[in-house]
Every structure is written in structure tokens, then in C-alpha cells.
A protein has these predicted regions:
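Basic, Lys/Arg-enriched alpha-helical interface segments
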Residues: 1-82, 95-96, 106-136
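Short, surface-exposed coil-to-beta transition loops
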Residues: 82-88
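Active-site beta-strand-loop-beta-strand hairpin of nuclease catalytic cores
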Residues: 92-101
Length: 136
């Protein structure tokens, strides 16, 4: 069964995402990061389809709002997105059909032992309004 095409979502990389971990990817992978970022942008435009086909993980959903984890691989690395340990946290406003890239990070950068607790702390510190929506 083919699903009807839905209009694309608008998206933006939040300044915190740009300044922090994404900057690390840009330095480490140079041109491959540009291609990877373009791929992430394309996924954001079709995030509803990615969720439908389990290509992104829904973490929280409250009303029109969703918090989603997206695994990604850096272009040219030949590692699957899941195995790469690279993730983006996305905030989705379904009413406006808009996606915000909140954080792009490597598990190695955010580190063990509790990755979830660490990204929740970042959300609470940098995105207080979003943290309130999801009671983080």
C-alpha cells in the first residue's frame, strides 16, 4: 500500500546545535559533513515518513509536539546509521510542520554511562521551553 505524499516540513538548525557538536563533525569530517548535513536536512523535510517507516525514533509526543531521535552516518564512512553512534535530537511542531535540529552528536562525544540523562540535561539547559513541554 502506497501512502499519499505529504507536504514537506520546514526545518532549521538551532544555534546551539551549530555551535557545539555539529562543529566537531565539521572539523573532523570536512566535506563529508556537508553531504551528511544535506542528508539530515532532507530527512527533516520528510520526518513524518521517517517515523512511519521506523527510520527515526519517537521519544516523546505531547499534543502537536514531538521529540525524535534520528540516527545518522557520516557520508563515505560505510557504517550504518545505528552502528555509527551519531544522533540528532529533533523537535517537531506538527501544527506548523516545522522541525528544529536541537543537537547533533556522537555517542562518544556525549559519552557513557547514561547518554539519555546527558542529552536531557542539555535540553533543560539550552531549550527550557521544550523541556517544559515534555516535562524533562
Amino acid at each position: 500500500m502506497e501512502l499519499p505524499m505529504s507536504p514537506n516540513y520546514s526545518f532549521e538548525w538551532m544555534p546551539f546545535a551549530e555551535r557545539h557538536y555539529a562543529k566537531t563533525f565539521a572539523k573532523k569530517y570536512k566535506n563529508s559533513w556537508l553531504e551528511t548535513r544535506d542528508n539530515i536536512d532532507e530527512v527533516c523535510k520528510r520526518i513524518d515518513r521517517m517515523l512511519d517507516f521506523d527510520r527515526a525514533d519517537l521519544i516523546y509526543s505531547v499534543g502537536y509536539y514531538k521529540l525524535v531521535k534520528l540516527d545518522f552516518a557520516v557520508a563515505g564512512t560505510r557504517i550504518s546509521p545505528k552502528k555509527s553512534g551519531n544522533r540528532c535530537l529533533l523537535f517537531i511542531n506538527e501544527e506548523m510542520r516545522h522541525v528544529q535540529v536541537l543537537i547533533a552528536y556522537s555517542k562518544n562525544d556525549i559519552g557513557p554511562p547514561n547518554e539519555t540523562a546527558k542529552w536531557k540535561r542539555v535540553i533543560k539547559a539550552e531549550y527550557k521551553d521544550i523541556a517544559e513541554i515534555f516535562s524533562l
